[in-house]
Amino acid sequence: MSKVDRWLLPEGISELLPDDALQVETLRRRLVDVFQRWGYEYVITPMIEFTDSLLTGSGGDIDLLTFKLTDQLTGKTLGIRADITPQAARMDAHSLKRSGANRLCYAGHVVHTRPQVALGSRTPIQVGVELFGEPGLDADIEVISLLLEVLSLVGMPKQYLDIGHVGVFRALTEAAGFSKEQENTLFLLLQAKAATEIKDWVTTHVREPKLQHWFLELPKLSGSAGVLDRARDVFADAPAEVMVALDELSSIADVVQPRYPDAQLYFDLSELRGYHYHTGIVFGAFSPGVGNAIAKGGRYDHIGEAFGRARPATGFAADLSVICRTLNVETAPPNPGVFAPASTNAAQWQEIQSLREAGERVVSGLSIQDAPYDHQNCDRILIETDTGFQVKAL
């Protein structure tokens, strides 16, 4: 690599300069404070783990996103975390071993082998919550409510929440007796919203008229809460699991909408985000003019099985950098500081420390520097007088 190119970062790898770093860190602190006020305990997970535990129960997508290397001490394969959720599940199942509901929150970098969206970062700063141990809908409602609370906190002018339930599609494919390959093919077509291809595939591979009707109507069932009533008519004679899923979606609308009347809840029964990972309610938050979800989550009830302790779970995660960039989160710049000219005077040092303890930002001069640089943002200077030290305006 030439000297000219040594400053280049790998594609998708980003750095945050002071203003952006301050914005992200300020938001991180605000969000973690909110999580803790809701009863979620902050945890810090390791950046690197054995892949045997890091990828357990997380699905093939996370495996492909994970950088792997060989541990020089054991010869085993290590992975750099691409998602903190499986680590939180390991903590819940093995490290903490608590009974009842267990609420955890986290914030930290993850690393991906490739961006998940076009021009996206391979080093997202993931922040999120996980609620373990509660199988009931109360947990899903709490997590969705917390996400809407967060979106309101960061100044999102209008909250758009896309909600689905993987149980609908799963029950229908089981009723149709699809093979794994057929199920995956239809899943991909639904995610692509390829109406013509869906119709062609269904009419070719599904012979029973009733089943054809279900699968052809599925991608059309999206909209406000009223679409759930229409879905009940469409799936009137479908497996009971479908009605259970629709009832859960209705309950979410009945509870969450009054809590957050300004939020727009959008139900999409063909939304299967994380289908191979989630087991029930799934959701994503969107901002006007942004095509990709700025936060997403859902229920995943089997992730703890591999750690010897199956626990129901639900949660959500977001990328702090994306939230800051998308929503232009406002953060107050640091207060102008006090500049202290270079000196080894013990009395000046004591005065500087007193100012810092009082909450002032004090920048000490170095070498022969007798005035602050512009980027140091100081509007006052510490000077020595006959009677002691004084802070004066610059």
From Swiss-Prot:
Subcellular location: Cytoplasm
Any GO molecular function: histidine-tRNA ligase activity
Pathway membership, UniProt: Amino-acid biosynthesis; L-histidine biosynthesis; L-histidine from 5-phospho-alpha-D-ribose 1-diphosphate: step 1/9
Keyword DNA-binding tagged: no
Pfam families per record: tRNA-synt_His
Main location: cytoplasm
Keyword terms, alphabetized: Amino-acid biosynthesis, Cytoplasm, Histidine biosynthesis
Listed InterPro entries: aa-tRNA-synth_II/BPL/LPL, HisRS-like_core, HisRS/HisZ, HisZ
GO process annotations (BP): histidyl-tRNA aminoacylation; L-histidine biosynthetic process
GO cellular component, one term: cytoplasm
NCBIfam families, per the entry: hisZ_biosyn_reg, PRK12292.1-1, PRK12421.1
Family the UniProt entry places it in: Belongs to the class-II aminoacyl-tRNA synthetase family. HisZ subfamily.
Anything else known: This function is generally fulfilled by the C-terminal part of HisG, which is missing in some bacteria such as this one.
Complexes and interactors: Heteromultimer composed of HisG and HisZ subunits.
Function: Required for the first step of histidine biosynthesis. May allow the feedback regulation of ATP phosphoribosyltransferase activity by histidine.
Protein name, UniProt field: ATP phosphoribosyltransferase regulatory subunit
UniProt gene name: hisZ
